[in-house]
C-alpha cells in the first residue's frame, strides 16, 4: 500500500482526457450502481435541509447533485482540480432545476474559510491525491466542529469467492471495456491498480486518525467491499 503515490499532474492530465466520456464509462462499468452508492453517502452523512455542503473532486457533479436534492435551500459547492471534468456539471444541475456552484479547487489547498460547511465530501477522489492525510485535514478545516467529512472510495473485496471473481473482472475486463467506451484504457488500468493498492477499512481510518482532525471515525461496506463510505466527525 505504501507504493501508491499518485502524481497530481499525471492524474490531472489523465482525467482531462477521459472527461468527455466519464459519465458513460461510469454507468457502463458499474451498471449504474455508483448512483446508489452516492445516495447512500448522502443519507449516511445526516445532511438536512439548509445545510451548507462542499463536494471535493466533484467531477461531473453527481454527488453535489445528490446533496442538493437533500439540502434544498442550503448551498452546495462542487469543486475539482481538473477544469475539464467540471465542464458538464453546471448543465447537469440545470437540467434538474438545481442551483449548484461549481469551482476549480485543489482539495489539499481549499480557498474557503475555516468552519464554512456542515458537510464536506469526496467520492472516488481521495486515492488520487498525492497526500491524502493533508486532504483530510483540509476538508476538516473548512467544516464546522461537529460537522461531517464523508469519503466514498473503492477498496479491496474481502469475501473469498466474490473477491476472486471481482479481482478477475477488475484486472482483465474492466480496463478493456473502459478503453472501448472512453478511448482511455490507461485510465481504467490505473483505476484497478490504485483501488487495489489504496488503504481501505481500518487502513483508511488510520489515515483519518493521522490527520488528527476527527473526534469519531467510522465506515460502512458497499457491495461486498467493492467500495466503502467513511464518515469523520470534525473536532
From Swiss-Prot:
Which top EC class applies here? transferase
Q: Which reaction does it catalyse?
A: a 2-demethylmenaquinol + S-adenosyl-L-methionine = a menaquinol + S-adenosyl-L-homocysteine + H(+); a 2-methoxy-6-(all-trans-polyprenyl)benzene-1,4-diol + S-adenosyl-L-methionine = a 5-methoxy-2-methyl-3-(all-trans-polyprenyl)benzene-1,4-diol + S-adenosyl-L-homocysteine + H(+)
Q: What protein am I looking at? A: Ubiquinone/menaquinone biosynthesis C-methyltransferase UbiE
Gene Ontology MF terms: 2-methoxy-6-polyprenyl-1,4-benzoquinol methyltransferase activity; demethylmenaquinone methyltransferase activity
Q: Which residues cross the membrane?
A: none
InterPro entries in the cross-refs: SAM-dependent_MTases_sf, UbiE/COQ5_MeTrFase, UbiE/COQ5_MeTrFase_CS
HAMAP family cross-referenced by the UniProt entry? MenG_UbiE_methyltr
Amino acid at each position: 500500500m505504501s507504493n501508491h503515490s499518485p502524481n497530481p499532474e499525471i492524474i490531472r492530465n489523465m482525467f482531462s482526457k477521459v472527461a468527455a466520456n466519464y459519465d458513460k464509462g461510469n454507468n457502463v462499468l458499474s451498471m449504474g450502481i455508483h448512483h446508489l452508492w452516492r445516495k447512500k453517502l448522502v443519507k449516511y452523512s445526516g445532511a438536512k435541509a439548509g445545510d451548507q455542503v462542499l463536494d471535493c473532486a466533484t467531477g461531473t457533479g453527481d454527488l453535489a447533485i445528490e446533496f442538493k436534492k437533500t439540502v434544498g435551500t442550503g448551498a452546495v459547492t462542487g469543486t475539482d482540480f481538473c477544469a475539464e471534468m467540471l465542464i458538464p456539471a453546471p448543465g447537469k444541475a440545470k437540467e434538474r432545476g438545481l442551483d449548484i456552484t461549481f469551482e476549480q479547487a485543489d482539495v489539499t489547498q481549499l480557498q474557503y474559510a475555516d468552519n464554512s460547511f456542515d458537510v464536506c465530501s469526496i467520492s472516488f477522489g481521495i486515492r488520487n491525491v498525492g497526500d491524502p492525510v493533508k486532504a483530510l485535514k483540509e476538508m476538516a478545516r473548512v467544516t464546522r466542529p461537529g460537522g461531517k467529512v464523508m469519503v466514498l472510495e473503492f477498496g479491496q473485496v474481502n469475501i473469498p469467492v466474490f473477491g476472486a471473481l471481482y479481482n478477475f473482472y477488475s484486472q482483465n475486463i474492466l480496463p478493456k471495456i473502459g478503453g472501448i467506451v472512453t478511448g482511455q484504457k490507461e485510465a481504467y488500468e490505473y483505476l484497478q491498480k490504485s483501488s487495489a493498492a489504496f488503504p481501505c477499512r481500518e487502513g483508511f481510518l488510520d489515515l483519518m486518525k493521522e490527520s488528527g482532525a476527527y473526534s469519531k471515525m467510522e465506515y460502512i461496506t458497499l457491495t461486498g467491499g467493492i467500495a466503502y463510505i467513511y464518515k469523520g466527525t470534525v473536532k
